[in-house]
Amino acid sequence: MALKGLDWSGFHAPTLDDIEALASAALAALPEPFKSLSAEVTCSVAEFAEDDIIAHFGMESPFELMGLFTGIGMTHDGAVPHTGQFPNTVFLYRRAILDYWAEHDEDTLGDIVTHVLIHELGHHFG
């Protein structure tokens, strides 16, 4: 039975593109020198982490992982990419982020995306 007075027909969950836009805004707002030092780090948004990643970390559910840094951190010779090296990448996982957002109404979605992104960038910086 639908509740009268609540028309949700025009509302949809934030998309992968929406999360990517929030992440791009967070990256653009980074202060120097962090902005320039993270310029080569790519950001990718997916629904969930791959099953092998969830298993690697011993997690029971893909909802447990909101973000992941892959690559070689700056303190481990990752400041300058080597031939054949994949770029350092921050992965953001949309469904886990949205689930966290639904459970923690004191934070905006932008705040959560920014927090996860900065946490993962911390691994880039060592």
PLM regions and their residue ranges:
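Active-site rim/adjacent substrate-binding subdomains
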Residues: 1-112, 124
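Catalytic Zn2+-binding segment of zinc metalloproteases
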Residues: 120-126
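Short alpha-helical catalytic segment bearing the HExxH-like zincin motif
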Residues: 112-120
